[in-house]
From Swiss-Prot:
Protein name per the record: Fluoride-specific ion channel FluC 2
Regulation: Na(+) is not transported, but it plays an essential structural role and its presence is essential for fluoride channel function.
Organism listed in the record: Streptococcus pneumoniae (strain ATCC BAA-255 / R6)
Organismal lineage: Bacteria, Bacillati, Bacillota, Bacilli, Lactobacillales
Catalytic activity: fluoride(in) = fluoride(out)
Main location: membrane
């Protein structure tokens, strides 16, 4: 069997771990109807992991494609979700928390882009 045949299994297992980390972080951070801190935190954590580990350190060290796929697509994909960002956005909109909504979108999208940009420029 070729090692490429095991890539989906590695992605699957790493995604389960990423989802578990997401759940544990959401139970660790206090829930607030005013602002979705948990989603923002795990999305920033996912950006850091994706850029630092997958785009920087692991590629630089010549890590296998399977491990990079497992961590990037699997773990980071399970850790971060666009759907949670949208769900939190709709909740803030439905409850009339417009300032929190704008702040959340600015921090999520703008902050995420800035974090990815600056981490991506760094030479690991």
């Amino acid at each position: 069997m070729k090692k490429e045949q095991f890539y989906p299994l590695g992605i699957f297992l790493a995604a389960m771990l990423g989802g578990l980390v997401r759940y544990l972080v959401s139970t660790w951070l206090p829930a607030s109807p005013d602002f979705p801190w948990g989603t923002l935190f795990v999305n920033y954590l996912g950006i850091f992991c994706l850029i630092f580990l997958v785009k920087g350190y692991l590629v630089y060290k010549g890590t296998s494609k399977g491990l990079i796929l497992a961590l990037g697509t699997g773990f980071c994909g399970g850790l971060t979700t666009f759907s949670s960002l949208m769900l939190d956005t709709v909740k803030l909109l439905d409850t009339g928390r417009y300032f929190s909504l704008v702040l959340y979108l600015l921090l999520s999208i703008g902050g995420g882009l800035l974090l990815a940009y600056f981490l991506g420029r760094k030479k690991w």
